[in-house]
């Protein structure tokens, strides 16, 4: 009986493989998942590789629940799941860039190929199954829950800053906090801003008067000298005329 390596070298096997590649059909069971995700330029191929990654995630999430695993095995499994999550995100990014469906739209929740939601599959580094009960992890998750933050934010923070939504969730704030106030409609804010702008202009003008004269070779822009002349952009005809004059002067200098 021929070995698998000998079968792979046969003429018929290579012909069928080339024929399947030309038709866009890939047998995932006999093909390694490519590491260079951006090199795959077929949406069906990316869909199949993404499906394979989802199967591996689902299988490892089920395995991490086993009570016979040690803490080291649980940590290794959790690292592998997070690595697969990043790979899944890369495949989804490639699919979206090629014009395929946008799986990243619902990235807050992660589902396997059978439609079951995978708990803890959001953004950042996540803990799955028994990894949430590891020494140190459980305390960190409880502290993050009390602060109203995610575990990924809790890990990245050094304990000095406040995570996104941590303080806002515990305070009573209205629409004014998010910039939806009505102070612009009644003119209160606009009048205050105009007054502050006027004070800032007067302050700059006084500082400019106190400074020494402008250095040689420099001249103030129109509107900055306080002469009432506003700054005006030159028209296209004026720019072209200036460029022609400069070129004419350079030619005359070369001739002379």
UniProtKB/Swiss-Prot annotation:
GO terms for cellular component: catalytic step 2 spliceosome; cytoplasm; post-mRNA release spliceosomal complex; post-spliceosomal complex; Prp19 complex. It is found in: Cytoplasm; Nucleus. Keywords: Cytoplasm, mRNA processing, mRNA splicing, Nucleus, Spliceosome. Residues 209-218 have a biased composition (Acidic residues). Residues 145-167, 201-232 are annotated as: Disordered. Its main location: cytoplasm. GO terms for biological process: generation of catalytic spliceosome for second transesterification step; mRNA 3'-splice site recognition. It holds the Pfam family Isy1. SUPFAM superfamilies: ISY1 domain-like. Involved in pre-mRNA splicing. Associated with the spliceosome. Belongs to the ISY1 family. This is Pre-mRNA-splicing factor isy1. It comes from Emericella nidulans (strain FGSC A4 / ATCC 38163 / CBS 112.46 / NRRL 194 / M139). The lineage of its organism: Eukaryota, Fungi, Dikarya, Ascomycota, Pezizomycotina. The gene is isy1.
